[in-house]
A protein has these predicted regions:
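Short, well-ordered alpha-helical segments
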Residues: 3, 7, 11, 47-52, ...
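GG-anchored amphipathic helix commonly corresponding to the ABC/SMC/Rad50 NBD signature/C-loop
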Residues: 46-71
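Domain-scale terminal segments
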Residues: 41, 67-68, 84-85, 100, ...
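C-terminal lobe/lid and adjacent interdomain/linker elements of RecA-like ASCE P-loop ATPase modules
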Residues: 87-151
Length: 151
């Protein structure tokens, strides 16, 4: 099973790095499943390498883990001011490579023309996900759901 997991990791990461136009990493640098991509990659290709790396692990967990699959949270994927070609690749990559039946929470200032075919929540208050006017409603809803867990 270990060999299957490691093989899957290498295959996925190699494929994802190519899709995201990351060519500066050698296979020897990312071949070990314990490698730390963030310390090996610099510049504008670093965010793309990290997205490839994280999505590889999302797919590994989906395929090989029996535990509950958590939502994927990607905040501001346009790091290091990607050029237009690369930000397009990043957005399309996220859209096309989200593991099947997974929930994605994507924090974006702009969609760059990619239709993620999902519910969009527009935040209107800086540094706030919830609005003060909604606290009581959300509190009641959450208490109700938590109470159901204990029944």
């Amino acid at each position: 099973r270990k060999d299957e997991i490691v093989g899957y990791y290498r295959t996925k990461l190699t494929s994802f790095l190519k899709k995201l136009d990351v060519h500066s990493l050698t296979e020897d640098e990312y071949k070990p499943i314990t490698s730390k991509i963030e310390s090996k990659e610099t510049g504008s290709s670093r965010p793309r390498a990290l997205i490839a790396y994280y999505f590889t692990f999302f797919h590994l967990m989906k395929k090989f883990s029996s535990s509950t699959y958590f939502p994927l949270i990607v905040d501001s994927p346009n790091q290091q001011d990607q050029d237009v070609e690369h930000i397009d690749k990043i957005m399309k990559f996220i859209q096309e490579n989200q593991p099947k039946d997974s929930q994605l929470i994507l924090g974006l200032a702009e969609t760059y023309g990619v239709d993620f075919k999902c519910k969009t929540i527009t935040l209107t208050e800086k540094y706030s996900l919830l609005q003060k006017s909604e606290y009581d409603n959300v509190h009641e809803e959450m208490i109700g759901k938590l109470s159901e867990l204990w029944e």
